[in-house]
Amino acid sequence: MPELPEVEVTRRSFAGAIEGATVRGITVGKPLRWPLGTEPAVLVGRRVCGVRRRGKYLLLDLDEGLLLIHLGMSGSLRFARDLPARGAHDHFELITDHGTLRLHDPRRFGAVVWAAGESDPRARKLLDGWGLEPLGEDFAFEAFHAGLRAKRTPIKQLLLAGTVVVGVGNIYACEVLFLAGIRPTTRACAIGPQRARRLHGAIREVLARAVERGGSTLRDFSSADGSAGHFQLEANVYGRAGLQCRQCGTPVRLSRQGQRSTYFCPHCQRA
């Protein structure tokens, strides 16, 4: 599933090119996870004012309303003036005078939803309840630590839930906890101030580095300009079960936690 770094990389890869564009048409394919929420003709003539990100959602601000885009489990966006003919898994196109934005989504768990604004019930249903933005200025340690103290959930599962901090997917949760030296099964409320600060810093560091590397391409992710990500090539623990820890030489372990694969070093992450 594309996580925060992949979504941010996608945003950066086409935001400048589409800003100021006028919508000329909409192409809708097979049904996605949620319906568009308006007739496609309503969007024709609208101008794209900018592209933002909230967690794993992209927000295309229009001069009237906005489009919320979620990439689902296997989705990706492409933006270009001349795209090849639509394929069987291309389910949405926003055609503008700057180029076409196309959603490719083989499993159709993604969505493009129109809303009148962020206070629209459709937008609130998707955006409300998410935690702090880890790459934003409001990712304050005090609020983050308060969120940890209130939960008895194992820290790895709390990171994945997105209610305290948003967008930390499985690969990044494993890498963050390794960098912070915290065992994935440790209860969030048991993490004291010193370790919480290490965790807070590790979240920023890992996600920022992932964005710089273009995200992670584990199967089929690419940004809107077709570029693959490379973060997975330098992972310390994720995908390295049985291999020596890059830091101490202990074999990396693999376990199942909340139906997800968890990679950790038993020596570097003792508690």
UniProtKB/Swiss-Prot annotation:
InterPro entries: DNA_glyclase/AP_lyase_DNA-bd (IPR015886), DNA_glyclase_Znf_dom_DNA_BS (IPR015887), Formamido-pyr_DNA_Glyclase (IPR020629), FPG_cat (IPR012319), MutM-like_N-ter (IPR035937), Ribosomal_uS13-like_H2TH (IPR010979), Znf_DNA_glyclase/AP_lyase (IPR000214), Znf_FPG/IleRS (IPR010663)
Naturally occurring in which organism (per UniProt): Acidovorax ebreus (strain TPSY) (Diaphorobacter sp. (strain TPSY))
Binding-site residues, DNA: 89, 107, 151
Keywords (A to Z) from UniProt: DNA damage, DNA repair, DNA-binding, Glycosidase, Hydrolase, Lyase, Metal-binding, Multifunctional enzyme, Zinc, Zinc-finger
Cofactor(s) needed for function: Zn(2+)
Free-text comment on the cofactor: Binds 1 zinc ion per subunit.
Keyword DNA damage: yes
Matching PROSITE patterns: FPG_CAT, ZF_FPG_1, ZF_FPG_2
NCBIfam families named in the record: fpg, PRK01103.1
Subunit structure: Monomer.
Lineage: superkingdom: Bacteria
GO MF annotation, one: class I DNA-(apurinic or apyrimidinic site) endonuclease activity
Family according to the record: Belongs to the FPG family.
Reported function: Involved in base excision repair of DNA damaged by oxidation or by mutagenic agents. Acts as a DNA glycosylase that recognizes and removes damaged bases. Has a preference for oxidized purines, such as 7,8-dihydro-8-oxoguanine (8-oxoG). Has AP (apurinic/apyrimidinic) lyase activity and introduces nicks in the DNA strand. Cleaves the DNA backbone by beta-delta elimination to generate a single-strand break at the site of the removed base with both 3'- and 5'-phosphates.
Zinc finger (FPG-type): 236-270
Protein name (database record): Formamidopyrimidine-DNA glycosylase
Active site annotation, chain numbering: 2 (schiff-base intermediate with dna), 3 (proton donor), 56 (proton donor), 260 (proton donor)
Reaction catalysed by this enzyme: Hydrolysis of DNA containing ring-opened 7-methylguanine residues, releasing 2,6-diamino-4-hydroxy-5-(N-methyl)formamidopyrimidine; 2'-deoxyribonucleotide-(2'-deoxyribose 5'-phosphate)-2'-deoxyribonucleotide-DNA = a 3'-end 2'-deoxyribonucleotide-(2,3-dehydro-2,3-deoxyribose 5'-phosphate)-DNA + a 5'-end 5'-phospho-2'-deoxyribonucleoside-DNA + H(+)
Enzyme Commission no: 3.2.2.23, 4.2.99.18
